[in-house]
A protein has these predicted regions:
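Surface-exposed, charge/polar-rich loops and edge strands
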Residues: 1-54, 59-206
């Protein structure tokens, strides 16, 4: 009798745990959905003049500055079709503050060609975005060959001798090469699946 009672307590405890975990995922799901909606609305807004007082993630901006083509960074990445190449990233000085501007993707053979630097730095429209975390499975950057796999801040400081804003400017526009990267609200949102898993586990042990 005692063992049966303890077993029932054990089962009830885990049912409550699974329900609590499922409920937490529902809360996270609502938060994530609201965040995605905010980002989508922000990306639909017209660009505003970049200033020190209005910087935020996914803010569309317009500005001008002085680009450093000598310290141009070539970041390995795939384009939307899955073709490997480089994203071209430059230091840019805007109102005495250093930023990195991601001008878009090029195929490998365009690296170090003059045509990719035909660019009007006095008429820049783009989107601010904070840098994502480094994937631990990516190789180290080859700074000497200017072949990058991540925007490691220590490597960037070594390469450029400068520190930069946490916001990267992703260029908008109809450029052929580099081809600007389209910024979307494509954020991982698996909370519904996780919630269903926890609730299913709670039901399965009834």
């Amino acid at each position: 009798m005692k063992h049966k009672f303890l077993f029932s307590v054990f089962i009830i405890f885990f049912i409550f745990v699974f329900i609590a975990l499922g409920s937490w995922q529902i809360i996270r799901l609502n938060w994530k959905n609201n965040l995605i909606l905010e980002i989508e609305n922000s990306l639909k807004n017209p660009p505003v003049e970049l200033s020190k007082s209005n910087k935020e993630n996914f803010l569309r901006i317009k500005t001008s500055g002085t680009i450093d083509f000598e310290k141009q960074i070539y970041l390995y990445n795939l384009n939307d079709s899955g073709t490997p190449g480089f994203e071209v990233i430059n230091p840019i000085l805007i109102e005495n503050e250093n930023y990195l501007i991601n001008r878009g993707w090029i195929p490998f053979e365009k690296k170090d060609t003059l045509e990719i630097n035909i660019f009007d730095q006095n008429d820049i429209t783009g989107t601010l975005k904070t840098q994502g975390r480094k994937n631990i499975f990516k190789p180290d950057n080859d700074i000497e060959e200017n072949y990058w796999f991540s925007l490691n801040r220590e490597d960037i400081l070594q390469f450029t001798g400068k520190e930069f804003s946490k916001y990267i400017i992703y260029l908008d526009g109809n450029y052929q090469f580099p081809r600007p990267k389209k910024i979307t609200a494509n954020i991982s949102n698996n909370h519904k699946k996780y919630a269903m898993t926890w609730f299913s586990l709670a039901i399965s042990i009834l």
